[in-house]
Amino acid sequence: MIDKIKLIDSALEAQLKAICPYSNYPVGAALLSDDNNIIIGFNIESKAYPTTLCAERVAIFSALSQGYTNFIAMSVVTTDGATPCGSCRQIIAEYAGDIPIIISDSKKNFKETTTFKLFPHPFI
């Protein structure tokens, strides 16, 4: 069973680490592996804005670099509860598959969806 609040709390902690001096829009993500480890990510902005990395991709790439390959859920926290961008949806679909995604605002108001509900026709 997925502990949604623990996953949201982990994403909230990650959100506090966001490096977003240009947008001032911190995002945190928490990815749950099949062996119950939580890998976090946060957005990291660059002056060359296209090179900016989103929290969701940082979490997935960090997990992959640590040897994790199977994931069972993800939580994403933004100030207002926004959903992942298209690039992140593609990466989630490609590397995590159709997993539950918990979308939350900073006050823990959340909704649940899945990868393929957000992105029904990924390029995979």
Q: Where are the language model's segments positioned?
A:
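Charged, amphipathic alpha-helical segments
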Residues: K4, D9, C85-G86
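Short solvent-exposed loop/turn micro-motifs enriched in small/polar/acidic residues
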Residues: Y22-N24, C85
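Short beta-strand scaffold segments in enzyme catalytic cores
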Residues: P26-S33
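Short, basic/aromatic recognition patches
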Residues: L7-C20
